[in-house]
Amino acid sequence: MIQSRTHTCGELRLGNVNERVTLAGWMENVRVVGSNFAFVVLRDFYGTTQIVVETEEMMNIIKGINKESTISVTGTVRERASKNAKQPTGEIEVVPEKIEMLGRCIYNELPFEINRSREADETQRLKYRYLDLRNPEVKNNIILRCNVIAALRKAMLEHNFLEITTPILTASSPEGARDYLVPARKHPGKFYALPQAPQQFKQLLMTSGFDRYFQIAPCFRDEDARGDRSPGEFYQLDMEMAFASQEDVFSVIEDVLPPIFAKYGTYNVASSAPFKRIAYNDALEQFGTDKPDYRIDLRIQDITKLVAGSEFAPFAEGNTVKAIACSGCELTRKHIDKLCADVEVQAGFKPYWFKVEADGSFAGGVAKFMTPHHDAVVEALGLTPGTLIGIAAGKKSAAQKTAGVMRKMLGALVPGHMDKERYEFCWVVDFPMYEIGEESGELEFCHNPFSMPGGGAETLRKAIAGEIDPLTITAQQYDLVCNGIELSSGAVRNHDPEIMIEAFRLVRLGEEDVKKKSPAMYNAFCYGAPPHAGIAPGVDRMVMLLAGEDSIREIIPFPMNKNAQDILMGAPGTVTDKQLEELHIKVDIDE
């Protein structure tokens, strides 16, 4: 019979000296220093403890055990002669009188060294994820995730939100990302879908009379992976509030998130309420993106008019010219060229540059085309000697994007322009309700068609009557951004069927189209719905930020790879002909 452990491997201290204890864990390492003398590192979830083998009997047992086997050790605690101040248990060691095998590792060689697993090939790490997770550094990310979710749940309950789970099997919503479909055995030819988000259900809860809802919601989208996006499955802090405005949502988020970021983050500084706010169009103008990183003090400025008439082709009439002035820049020509090449790869458009010399003259890059406009440019940009000016030129959207990428890279490269060790939140507001479609050339919804338009029905009717330009209509939508990463989108919902119909009329759709897109929600709203608003910050992205990781896969216990494959479990995989027959499915693959 296995003896229960009396302590964990991270627990023993000098106060336990002379106690008889039983520990259990993985045999991490063995260092033999004599015929009957060895040091063993025993590891469990809580830490490591040094075991000192001093007898022939114990040495013979240890010699027959492979690393990463699980063992039980019973022995006496004593003070270490050579202490390790870096280790919590570094002042003690255990001298064993009994060692039992619990779970044998049958392999002499491991796929990778446990404590250096992050250096291994990612495919190997995912294939042997259970070994990868034994690495304390990897394991700590999962512990962090658990703590953050617990803190989010506690905070939401304290704000009088009810945690309500919503269905996992639901109807397909093809207007969003691709759905994961689930065949319905009892209904041949029909399919459920895994929810891309609990959007309609949470709005139906508001219509049902619930006042404040939340859940740590699993969401499923068949989309490609990115560094900050896991394919397949992700989780979000989903919330909705009845009889609420944008300000009510902001108030809750600004109260809930900063303490959690300050407590659990790599950096212990997080912006407090109220968060900075910026309109969508202003964000594009000043930051070159709708995901502004306020830690960087550089701002983009428009110099189109200042360089009018320039002989430089990219500055030609009809193009937009943007500038970023970065003072105190000591980058060499080689580094500047590398910077510009990196910007072009990321933005897809070529940037330009010049510098201000000690005597105030312009040099390098496109200096000869800027010199004729010297005084005006110096005054407009507030230039001083040693300043590097990044230039982006082209169509407005291209110039904004290129300048935005260059701004971020300069902020990270040039000392003094980025306060990296903090979490800086901001709200992006006043998104356009409509846009001209690139392919159709006609008016289309810009983002969420079910958001409440600014000005409500009256604004829509004026647009339909031709009294105002529909492109000037803003939606009551908002994004939550932290350190240049979008954590969530949210909105004040359009809860009025009449306003919904007016909003769709502008894009040449009618009442039947509204009903077809969301029949249950539309019908529910016809029975009297409260004004409501919500948001859903991504849990995975929050934890990634808090852990200081660049890849979202590092904070997910069992992530898929970039190709949406679960290498560990072999998913997706084939199924039997009998299973397919029961589901009335025939697989036809083009060879």
Task: Place the predicted regions along the sequence by residue.
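Class II aminoacyl-tRNA synthetase catalytic cores and aaRS-like
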Residues: M1-E591
